[in-house]
């Protein structure tokens, strides 16, 4: 199969041969959903803290005697049943959100994403993608000429000028094939891949 070549002026050029094993697979929506959710879950870190009955500030004095008042027995005011008491199952920053995804499943999901991008015309090949200086304006002008606004660039080797120029653009990311993740691939409107990076992607996902 072929991937369309995108020129610097935004015009579509001749096709570039690509492996149908990576870019011609059927779309498995359930698998893609699973690996995207797992990727987001694995990026989470615990940032919530609630106190249990041992941690809330309280007195250990018994609120009233055990028998004879007609009220339900109570041991201390830190009980989770009381207003201001501790939580029974409190949130903790040590919570583990990790979801395991097997290598075969991950590769199959990535192949499915790349294939769907190719079908939708959201992935294009470029001969190379560089800027002369680490200036955001140079890169912004280049994207404007190409008619692009939300772009993920997958390059075979990270160019320092390109990386520095892209950091201040809100909808642009530059990665190497090994760093491409399922969330970024589905998030950006357009994915640009250098010719050498296509071969690296095929090698990673074969």
Curated annotation (Swiss-Prot):
Residues 59-70 have a biased composition (Basic residues). Signal peptide: none annotated. It comes from the Bacteria. Residues 49-58 have a biased composition (Basic and acidic residues). Residues 43-94 are annotated as: Disordered. Transmembrane segments: none annotated. NCBIfam families: rplD_bact. Part of the 50S ribosomal subunit. This is Large ribosomal subunit protein uL4. The lineage of its organism: Bacteria, Pseudomonadati, Pseudomonadota, Betaproteobacteria, Burkholderiales.
